[in-house]
Regions:
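Beta1/beta-strand and adjacent pyrophosphate-binding region of the FAD-binding site
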Residues: 2-15, 32
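Glycine-rich FAD pyrophosphate-binding loop
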Residues: 24-44
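Central beta-strand plus flanking loop segment that forms part of the substrate or channel wall
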Residues: 48-53, 88-91, 214-241, 300, ...
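Dinucleotide-binding Rossmann-like beta1-alpha1 core, especially the glycine-rich loop
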Residues: 49-127, 246, 253-258, 262-266, ...
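Flavin (FAD/FMN) cofactor-binding and adjacent substrate-gating region
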Residues: 70-73, 85, 94-170, 175-182, ...
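C-terminal catalytic lobe of FAD-dependent flavoproteins
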Residues: 150, 253, 262, 284-421
Length: 810
C-alpha cells in the first residue's frame, strides 16, 4: 500500500470506483481507492441495475446521459462485459397530470439531447404484450435506456482505473482522517496514506466518514425491496423464438418498476412505510447485507402489478431482496466540495447510484482537477443543506423522498414532512392572513395568500391552478397600492476589517459602493468566469459591509466567501442570517406607508434608490434599504429578529387605508420576470458568462483583478454561445413557461427557456431564456414548447415593465 497519493477515494461501490476511474482518466494516475471489504459489497451488489434517463433536472439529466453513453463504451475499452441491456424504458401514464409531467420532461430531454418518444396505449401493447393497457392514456419511451449488471460495471471501471495507474486496496478499513497543513492523512488498519484530496464515496457509511472530519453529511439509507419471480412460460417462449426483451416497464401511478430477469420478472415498488436503516451506521462487519423482507408493505403494489401485468400473478416468488439504498431529503445525491474544509470532497447519497455513478465521477473529477465543474451542479451541491438537517429531520425527509420517487413532480410541489422547522417571528401572523407556505433551506416562506373562501392549501399543477387568481390579486395590489413580503429567509452576513474592502473588491466583478449607506448589486464569478453567486452589498462604514443573498444558497454563498477570505485576521466574517429579519414594502404607496410608521425623511431627494438609512419603525431599529426585486417603489426593512412582530403590526395598522396586503413568493416571481430580473440557478449559472446573462453593467473588467477575470477575458475572446432574452409567449390558454422549455426556430432547438410566468401588470405571458446570440434581437420570432404544444414567441426589449426604472427611482 502506498504511503502517499494525490487522492484517496473512500468506498468501493460503483460510485467510488467511477470516481477513481474518472480521476485516472483525466490524467491523475497517483490516486488510490480504499474499500473496507470487497468491491460492490455495500449497496451496489444488490442494485437492480436500472439506468433511467428520466430526470426533471437540466443538470442531473446531463449527468445521466453521460453515464449511459459511457457504459456503452466500457467493454471495448476494458475488455470487461458490463451486461448492458439496451432494451428501452417505458413509463406509463393513467392521468392527464402524469402526461403533463412527461411533456415537461420531454422538453428538458430536448434541451440536453436525450431521445424520448410518446406512445399510445396500443403501441405499449406491441412492445410489452404482457401489459394490460386498460385505463392507460399513453406513455413515454427511452429507446437508449435499459439496465446493467452493477457488479460487472464496477469491475470494468476498476479495470479502466488500474490500467491508468490507479490502485485499489480491498479489505482495508479507514479508521481516521486528519487534516494537515499540506492536505490530509487517511489512517487505515493497514497503515496511513498522506494525500492532497479525500473523496468520500462511503455509501451507507457516509455519516461515519463525515464524522471523522467533523461533517454531518445529510445522508441516511432507506430499505428498498424488490421481488424476483420464477420463470414465466410466455417469457421463456419469447426468448426461444428470438423475440426482443420487453424492456423496463414503469407504472408511475402504481409506483413500481418491472423488468425481465432470467425468464421471470423483477418487481420493485416504492412503498409507503419503508423505514430508514443504519441510523447509527452499519456494523463494522457489514458486508453483502440484506434485511428481513416485509411483503405486507408491498401488497398494494403487488396487487396493482397483478392488474397491470396479469402474468406476474401466474408465477411464484423466487427471491425477495431488501437492502439499503442511500437517500437525501430531496432524493438527489450530494456531489461536490465539503463546506469549511479544503480538498475534502463528497460523492454520497445516491439513491440511483448505478445511473448517477458515471456522471458524478465525471463532473467531480473535473471539479477536483480543474477547480470547477463544467455543468452547474446546484441540484446536487452538498451545501444546499444546512445545520437544520439533523438526524431526526433526515429520517422523516428521507423516508418521504423514498415514497415519493414515483409521484408526479409538479413544479410548485412543496413536501410536508419535517415542517414547519425554521420560521420567522411573523409566521403565525402570516398564517392568520391566509398564507400557504413553502420552504427553502428549512425556512417557511409564504408562497401565496388564499382569497375568497379558498382553502388554505396548495394546488399543484403544471398548469394555472387555483392559486393563479390569488397571485393575480397580490400582483395587482403591489402595482396599485402597497404590498408586504417576508424575506427573512435571505442569507445575510457582515464582512469587516481593515482589508474588508480589498477582499470584497477581489471577490466580486462589480465595483463596491463607495459612500456609506450606498448599495450595489455584485456578482461573484467562479475561476472559469461563470456566475457563482449574487450579492446585494451595502457599505456600513469604511471597513464594514453588509451582504444579502438568496436564502437557498446560504451555506454555498457563505462558504464561497470563506474560501477566498484571508485567514490572517484582517477580514472577519459574521453570519447574521438567524439574527436579522427582513420585511419588504413595495408599491406606489410604499413611501406614504413608511412616513406613517417612521419620523425619518423618505423623500426621493433625501432617500435615493440604492441607498440605505438607519431608521426607527415604531420603537424598533431598522436598516431601511431602498431596493427590491419586484420593480416598484419600495424598501427592504432589515431588523433585529426580536423586533419583527412589532414592526409587522405597525406596518399593517398604518397601511389599512392604503390597501396594504401581504404577498408571497409566487407573486414576487411574476413581478421579477416582468422586469427581466435574474435568479441564480436559472438565468445565472456557472455554465454562462455574466455577459451571456445580461449582466454587462455589473461587470467591470478594468477595475482591477477579481476572481474569474482572466478566464472571463479568454471566454470573451473565444466568443459566447448564448444570450439571455425576454420573450412574450403568444396564444397561451392555461399554461405558462416553467423553465427548461426548448426554444425552436424552423423546427430546430436554438435555446432553452430558463424561467417564466404570467405577468399580471403587463397582461402577458413572459419567458426568460438563452438563445443563440445571432437570434437575440428585439422582434425576433421563435417558438417555445409548453407541455407538448408549440407557441409563438417574440423577443422583447429587456425589462418590458418600466424599462427605464422610473417607478423604482420615483
Amino acid at each position: 500500500m502506498k504511503s502517499k497519493a494525490k487522492v484517496v477515494v473512500i468506498g468501493g461501490g460503483a460510485v467510488g470506483v467511477s470516481m477513481l476511474y474518472h480521476l485516472a482518466k483525466k490524467g491523475w494516475s497517483d490516486v488510490v481507492l480504499v474499500e473496507r471489504k470487497e468491491l460492490t459489497s455495500g449497496s451496489t451488489w444488490h442494485a437492480a441495475g436500472l439506468l433511467p434517463l428520466f430526470n426533471m433536472s437540466y443538470s442531473v439529466g446531463q449527468l445521466h446521459k453521460y453515464a449511459v453513453n459511457l457504459y456503452k463504451t466500457l467493454e471495448k475499452e476494458t475488455g470487461k462485459n458490463v451486461g448492458f441491456s439496451v432494451v428501452s424504458n417505458i413509463r406509463l401514464a393513467s392521468t392527464k397530470d402524469r402526461m403533463d409531467e412527461y411533456h415537461q420532461y420531454a422538453g428538458v430531454a430536448q434541451t440536453i439531447g436525450v431521445n424520448v418518444k410518446f406512445l399510445k396505449p396500443e403501441q405499449v401493447k406491441e412492445i410489452w404484450p404482457l401489459c394490460n393497457i386498460e385505463g392507460l392514456i399513453g406513455a413515454i419511451q427511452h429507446p437508449e435506456d435499459g439496465y446493467i449488471q452493477s457488479a460487472d460495471l464496477t469491475q470494468a471501471l476498476a479495470t479502466g482505473a488500474r490500467n491508468r495507474g490507479a490502485e485499489i486496496y480491498r479489505n482495508t478499513t479507514v479508521v481516521g482522517i486528519k487534516e494537515t497543513k499540506s492536505g490530509w492523512v487517511v489512517e487505515t488498519d493497514k497503515g496511513t496514506i498522506e494525500c492532497e484530496h479525500v473523496v468520500s464515496c462511503s455509501g451507507n457509511f457516509a455519516r461515519q466518514t463525515g464524522e471523522m472530519v467533523g461533517l454531518d453529511i445529510p445522508v441516511i439509507p432507506v430499505e428498498h425491496q424488490y421481488i424476483v419471480t420464477e420463470p414465466h412460460p410466455k417469457i421463456v417462449k419469447r426468448k426461444k423464438e428470438g423475440l426482443p426483451e420487453m424492456g423496463v416497464l414503469r407504472d408511475s401511478d402504481g409506483r413500481w418498476y418491472m423488468r425481465e430477469e432470467a425468464g421471470g420478472l423483477i418487481l420493485g415498488p416504492y412503498e409507503d412505510g419503508a423505514p430508514c436503516c443504519y441510523l447509527d451506521g452499519p456494523s463494522k462487519d457489514s458486508e453483502y447485507e440484506l434485511f428481513q423482507e416485509d411483503l405486507d408493505r408491498l401488497m398494494p403494489h403487488i396487487e396493482g402489478a397483478y392488474h397491470r401485468v396479469p402474468a406476474f400473478k401466474e408465477v411464484g416468488v423466487k427471491k425477495v431482496y431488501n437492502g439499503a439504498i442511500c437517500y437525501t431529503p430531496d432524493g438527489n445525491p450530494i456531489v461536490g466540495p465539503a463546506w469549511g474544509l479544503k480538498n475534502f470532497w463528497i460523492n454520497e447519497g445516491h439513491s440511483f447510484g448505478i445511473t448517477a455513478a458515471g456522471g458524478a465521477g465525471w463532473q467531480l473529477a473535473e471539479w477536483i482537477i480543474d477547480g470547477e465543474p463544467t455543468i452547474d451542479m446546484l441540484g446536487v451541491e452538498p451545501r444546499r443543506y444546512g445545520d437544520y438537517a439533523t438526524k431526526s429531520y433526515l429520517k422523516e425527509k428521507n423516508e418521504e423522498a423514498y415514497r415519493n420517487v414515483f409521484i408526479i413532480h409538479y413544479p410548485d410541489e412543496e413536501r410536508s414532512a419535517a415542517r414547519p422547522l425554521r420560521t420567522a417571528p411573523c409566521y403565525e401572523r402570516m398564517k392568520k392572513l391566509g398564507a400557504v407556505f413553502g420552504q427553502k433551506f428549512g425556512w417557511e416562506r409564504a408562497n401565496f395568500f388564499a382569497i375568497d373562501g379558498m382553502e388554505q392549501k396548495d394546488d399543484w399543477s403544471f398548469r394555472r391552478s387555483k392559486w393563479f387568481k390569488a397571485v393575480e390579486k397580490e400582483c395587482k395590489n403591489v402595482k396599485e397600492n402597497v404590498g408586504l413580503l417576508d424575506m427573512t429567509a435571505f442569507a445575510k452576513c457582515r464582512i469587516k476589517g481593515p482589508k474588508a474592502e480589498t477582499f470584497l473588491d477581489y471577490l466580486v466583478a462589480n465595483k463596491l459602493p463607495k459612500k456609506i449607506g450606498r448599495i450595489n448589486l455584485c456578482h461573484a464569478l467562479n475561476t472559469k468566469g461563470g456566475v457563482h453567486s449574487e450579492f446585494t452589498i451595502m457599505r456600513e462604514s469604511e471597513d464594514s459591509f453588509y451582504l444579502v443573498s438568496a436564502g437557498a444558497f446560504q451555506r454555498l454563498d457563505h462558504d464561497w466567501i470563506l474560501k477566498w477570505m484571508s485567514k490572517d485576521g484582517s477580514v472577519q466574517f459574521e453570519n447574521l442570517t438567524n439574527s436579522v429579519g427582513v420585511l419588504v414594502v413595495s408599491g406606489p404607496k410604499a413611501r406614504e406607508l413608511m412616513k406613517r410608521v417612521s419620523k425619518d425623511d423618505f423623500s426621493n431627494e433625501n432617500f435615493k434608490w440604492l441607498s440605505s438609512k438607519q431608521i426607527n419603525v415604531g420603537y424598533a431599529p431598522v436598516n431601511a434599504m431602498r431596493v427590491n426585486f419586484v420593480g416598484e417603489l419600495g424598501w427592504e426593512l432589515h431588523h433585529p429578529m426580536e423586533y419583527q412582530n412589532h414592526i409587522f403590526d405597525k406596518l399593517m395598522e398604518a397601511g389599512k387605508d392604503l390597501g396594504l396586503k401581504p404577498y408571497g413568493i409566487r407573486a414576487m416571481n411574476s413581478l421579477r420576470v416582468e422586469k427581466s430580473y435574474k435568479l441564480v440557478g436559472t438565468e445565472l449559472s456557472i455554465e454562462y458568462s455574466p455577459y451571456e446573462s445580461g449582466l454587462d453593467r455589473f461587470i467591470h473588467p478594468n477595475k482591477g483583478n477579481f476572481v474569474g477575470l482572466e478566464a472571463l477575458n479568454k471566454w470573451r475572446e473565444k466568443g459566447f454561445q448564448n444570450k439571455l432574452v425576454t420573450l412574450e409567449v403568444h396564444n397561451i390558454i392555461d399554461a405558462d413557461v416553467l423553465g427548461n422549455n426548448p426554444i425552436y426556430q424552423n423546427g430546430k432547438v436554438v435555446g432553452r427557456a430558463t424561467g417564466g410566468d404570467f405577468g399580471f401588470r403587463l397582461s402577458k405571458s413572459i419567458a426568460l431564456g438563452m438563445v443563440k446570440p445571432e437570434l437575440a434581437t428585439t422582434g425576433q420570432k421563435l417558438k417555445i414548447d409548453i407541455l407538448g404544444k408549440m407557441h409563438d414567441a417574440t423577443i422583447l426589449d429587456e425589462s418590458p415593465y418600466d424599462p427605464e426604472n422610473k417607478l423604482l427611482r420615483s
